[in-house]
Each structure stands twice: as C-alpha cells, then as structure tokens.
Regions:
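Extended beta-strand-rich architecture
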Residues: 1-178
Length: 178
C-alpha cells in the first residue's frame, strides 16, 4: 500500500515496543510517502517524497545505569531540529492527531519542510500511553542536503556495556555439591 505519512507506523512501533517493555523509546524512519498531487515528471503517478519521521517520549530512559532518565519538552525537540537544519522558522498549526497548542510547521526559506508536535491527549489516552509523546516528519526532498549541519558521529564501542561486574572471594575449603 502507498503510505501518506510515517507517523501512523511510528506510533504503532512505539506502542509495540512499549508493550514489550522495551525501555528505548525514541525511533525514526526514513522512507517514501505518497500524496494525491501529480508527480512532477509523470502525471499519472502519485507524488513521492522522501521523509524522515521521528517519535520520542517525553521521558527518555537509558540502559546505562550510571545515567538518570531525562525529561524533555517540545522546546527540546525544537532544539534538535535546529541542530540538524539551519535557519528554520516555526508556525503553529492545527493538525489532526497533534495537540492543538503544541504542533508546528517547520519552514526554511519560506517553504514548508516538515511539521512536528505533541501527540494529542485524546490519542494518548486512546493508546494508553502514560508519557507525553512528540513526533514529526521532515521532508528530505525539500532540503538542500549540502546545507545540513555536519554532525560528527562517534562510533559505538566494540565491547558491550557491562551493567554489573561481580567478584567473590571464596574460601579454598568451599565445596560445591553437584
């Protein structure tokens, strides 16, 4: 089927992982979405756009027991978008599925390049989600990829993180009865 947005599948992914007690609760997807306007090249084909979709909880948890959970708000999400895309402007929007006071269109050079916001309270209650959820889409086709900020990637350690390292001193005379 042809998807018109990534948000519905991201919400499904978020809920599935929530039900599986997966504590990592930020997800993204880059994929093609379609709309009913005609394609620029072929008139009989729906318009296709490459979209970056994201979803995150207001309560970010970590598997690293040395760090505490982080509570975020809509302004933190806005700052992440600004870190990725230079010189964006935001305008409030009213969009189905989004909280009416916390949803925004993202503009760059007076052109809409995406939208984001908080999941509506009604949907949050319907899906039985306790924490606030922020989600959005960025239209990659509408961005000049050469203007994106370069973010240095730090590779993950090749050694797995160890939660506990336990050592025991056992007397020599200790015997295990098998």
């Amino acid at each position: 089927y042809l998807r018109s947005n990534l948000m519905s599948s991201l919400i499904d992914t978020y809920i599935f992982n929530l039900q599986q007690n997966n504590i990592l609760n930020s997800y993204f997807e880059i994929n093609t979405v379609f709309n009913s306007s005609p394609d620029n090249t072929f008139n009989d084909v729906p318009n296709q756009n490459v979209v970056l979709g994201f979803i995150t909880s207001a309560n970010l948890t970590t598997q690293d027991i040395r760090k505490s959970d982080q509570n975020i708000d809509i302004y933190y999400v806005k700052s992440l978008i600004n870190q990725l895309i230079n010189d964006t402007q935001l305008e409030p929007i009213i969009k189905p599925g989004f909280h009416q006071n916390y949803s925004f269109s993202i503009f760059k050079n007076n052109e809409i390049v995406g939208h984001f916001g908080q999941l509506s309270t009604e949907l949050q209650n319907n899906f039985e989600i306790e924490n606030e959820v922020f989600l959005g889409e960025i239209y990659v086709n509408k961005l000049n990829l050469n203007e994106l900020k370069l973010i240095n990637y730090k590779p993950l350690s090749q050694y797995p993180f160890i939660k506990f390292d336990l050592s025991f001193s056992v007397p020599v005379e200790f015997s295990a009865h098998l």
